[in-house]
Amino acid sequence: MVKLRLKRCGRKQRAVYRIVAIDVRSRREGRDLRKVGFYDPIKNQTYLNVPAILYFLEKGAQPTGTVQDILKKAEVFKELCPNQTKFN
């Protein structure tokens, strides 16, 4: 199963995160399938590759809680069909 989750980058006390599509059995810093976004909590900047995110969501990828909040804030779920916005 594939998940959309955060991968920590940056230096100590200055974390930035990549939003990646990754197999659930991989560790947090493991090899990802594709980088689909970027999130900097300090500067509150977000970059999302929306077509890639929609592709993985349509294929059944599940976003983690934090990634789901980021996607809701960016209104990515409005581009999906209404019956596909339910996640476990």
Curated annotation (Swiss-Prot):
One of its GO terms (cellular component) is ribosome. InterPro entries: Ribosomal_bS16, Ribosomal_bS16_CS, Ribosomal_bS16_dom_sf. Pfam families: Ribosomal_S16. One of its GO terms (molecular function) is structural constituent of ribosome. Its main location: plastid. Transmembrane segments: none annotated. It comes from the Eukaryota. Keywords: Chloroplast, Plastid, Ribonucleoprotein, Ribosomal protein. GO terms for biological process: translation. It is found in: Plastid, Chloroplast. Belongs to the bacterial ribosomal protein bS16 family. HAMAP family: Ribosomal_bS16. This is Small ribosomal subunit protein bS16c. The lineage of its organism: Eukaryota, Viridiplantae, Streptophyta, Embryophyta, Tracheophyta. The gene is rps16.
